[in-house]
Amino acid sequence: MEEFKRYFELDRYQQHDFLYPLIFQEYIYALAHDHGLNRSIFLENAGYDNKSSLLIVKRLITRMYQQNHFLISVNDSNQNQFLGHNKNFSYQMISEGFSVIVEIPFSLRLISSLEGKXIVXYPNLRSIHSIFPFLEDKFLHLNYVLDILIPYPIHLEILVQTLRHWVKDASSLHLLRFFLHEYRNWNSLITPKKXSFSCSKRNERLSLFLYNSHVXEYESIFVFLRNQSSHXRSTSSGALLERIHFYGKIELRVGVFAKDFQSXLWLFKDPFIHYVRXQGKSILASKGTXLLMNKWKYYLVNCWXCHFYVWSQPRNIYRNQLSNYSLDFLGYLSSXRLNTSMERSQMLENSYLI
């Protein structure tokens, strides 16, 4: 970690993170190979064993300096030569190392925050296991639910723009842009399937990093609910140390929302709103009225489009009344059964004897 820090100290006053030199360091790929999510990435390719994998990486990095080795054809076939090797194999190898590199700013900020000051504990930051108490204890007392499919970026460039808030190294962002645009037709990193995300299994680490970066931006609009919500962490966020910085980053956006949405701030004063998220969808449940949930629905759509440049159609947000709706979440069907009681009233006529 000390060896990584020196690349950040070159221009610290301007807060530029020089990550690009790390791409050409061989030990980065050894780290990705030993501690990455796809340990078998080097072993699945015929003709390459564990002992020769680092030598292959070193040759690939050396050839990146030479322009004549970028033999990229218009045809997106798996047999195209990229850096003198199989295109998919070379891309996987380099992008795995690149994934480790772009995670460094997140880990360094986490370490500095731990050493510099005590982190405020948020009692609403709960694990995936908090969903079940929510369904058992809170669900029965709510009236309406918004079943939300997490919106996906309109364009791959949106993912790059999202990382610009974290990584200030232009060269690294250009390389990421090259990866995304060159391989957007090859088993896409983040593929919208039925308006939900599907991460590539061939490069899971980079897919999860980009996915969680995008979801962190999407969820930042719920800053006003952080003290009341039942927040469930995504089960696929293991590759991104984002949770602490998620709450630190959204504090900066409070002024933006307070300025642009003064008339809508009363929406966030409902103390009976609960929020959970998992498996490409999120749920916003409330004890409020149907009018309040409709206002939430159109506010979310407009806010995502204006501030985060993500496309979410109103038809991807379903408003349902819990008395007539079964909630499908994490393989469980939950419904609220109304206990009706019948009351009989009888008017007694007073008779007066005259």
From Swiss-Prot:
Q: Glycoprotein as a keyword?
A: no
Record's keyword annotation contains Plastid: yes
Query: Which GO terms of the cellular component aspect does the record hold?
Result: chloroplast
Compartments where found? Plastid, Chloroplast
User: Mind listing the GO molecular function terms for this protein?
Assistant: RNA binding
Query: Where is this protein primarily located?
Result: plastid
Q: Which GO terms describe its biological process?
A: mRNA processing; tRNA processing
The record's annotation in InterPro entries points to: Maturase_MatK, Maturase_MatK_N
According to the UniProt entry, the coiled-coil residues are none
Supply the Pfam families for this chain. Answer: MatK_N (PF01824)
Top-level lineage group: Eukaryota
Q: Kindly state which keywords UniProt assigns to this record, in alphabetical order.
A: Chloroplast, mRNA processing, Plastid, RNA-binding, tRNA processing
Q: What does this protein do?
A: Usually encoded in the trnK tRNA gene intron. Probably assists in splicing its own and other chloroplast group II introns.
Please give the family membership noted in the entry: Belongs to the intron maturase 2 family. MatK subfamily.
The protein here is known as Maturase K
What organism does this protein naturally occur in? Hydrangea quercifolia (Oakleaf hydrangea)
Q: What is the lineage of its organism?
A: Eukaryota, Viridiplantae, Streptophyta, Embryophyta, Tracheophyta
